[in-house]
Swiss-Prot record:
A motif (Cx2C motif 2) lies at residues 286-289. Keywords: 2Fe-2S, 4Fe-4S, Cytoplasm, Iron, Iron-sulfur, Metal-binding, Mitochondrion. [2Fe-2S] cluster binds at residues 214, 225, 228, 230. This is Fe-S cluster assembly protein DRE2. The lineage of its organism: Eukaryota, Fungi, Dikarya, Ascomycota, Pezizomycotina. [4Fe-4S] cluster binds at residues 275, 278, 286, 289. It comes from Arthroderma otae (strain ATCC MYA-4605 / CBS 113480). Monomer. Interacts with TAH18. Interacts with MIA40.
Amino acid sequence: MSPAAILSDVPRVLLLSPPSLSSNPDKLAELLNQYDKNTRDLQMIDRLAAGLVSLPESTYNLVLLLTDIDGTSTESERLVGRDVLQQIARTLQPGGIMKYHDGLSAMIKEPARTEAILSGLIANDKGELVKPVFEEQSVLLPFSINRSQKSIKGININKSDQQPAILQKNIVTLTNNTNDIFNGLEGDDDELIDEDELINEDELERPIIQPPECRPKAGKRRRACKDCTCGLAQKLEAEDKRQRANADEKLSALKLNSGEIAEVDFTIQGKTGSCGNCSLGDAFRCDGCPYIGLPPFKPGEEVKLFDNDVQL
């Protein structure tokens, strides 16, 4: 057998020391010499509480809290909080014990004792805090449907002498006492319900009441749901169509025919603006003339604008 396998069977001990004890190396060394150095580990409670170190999972059979330098447990219990106790419960093997090194485990005061119980530890008859051992067991659950005692196609399903199927380890076991479970294959009495029969014509013609949460708020237009059934989607669609029709109507009113275009198109020979002075220059042009800034040109001469550059 390998040395690692031998050490794995030896109980492991974890010593948790308060900071005050580390200030006295002689006393700490005396406590460490009481345990085999191959099977014991030492951790400082303050470093564990600060999250600077972490404990391995399911490793130790015994976790010992060392008392303070003055022999009390004030400093240890102050540092042992919920996070530390959760790590202790996790690092203990099932059946592992947590106590003080002098055996005064019952002296662990509140709230540390309550936090230890909430972390998963329980108190035994000696007052020690122990990590419980959860045994694996199978539970028999009868699975049966009591209907008529029939068989399908020569297969007798109503056999009560069949042995239950025992599954391995902690898996729920079902007993095979199914009484005519396939009886529904012969004739199903369930009838399909016509959805149209659930609502009459009066209910269909009734106006849809819009829920308060679907009503648009002031200053904000609410979007309809993807599967809208309250009528908001139809209302918004009608509003969009009405606005589009109004916009098209206004746009058509601004359209000019060929004759009207010729009246204001100065590139057509013989056509001038209402003032008749657009081609004479800025001195003769109106304030709103589109040709302000252009040099004088002859009536009928083509004028193009490219990037604010005038080309005649």
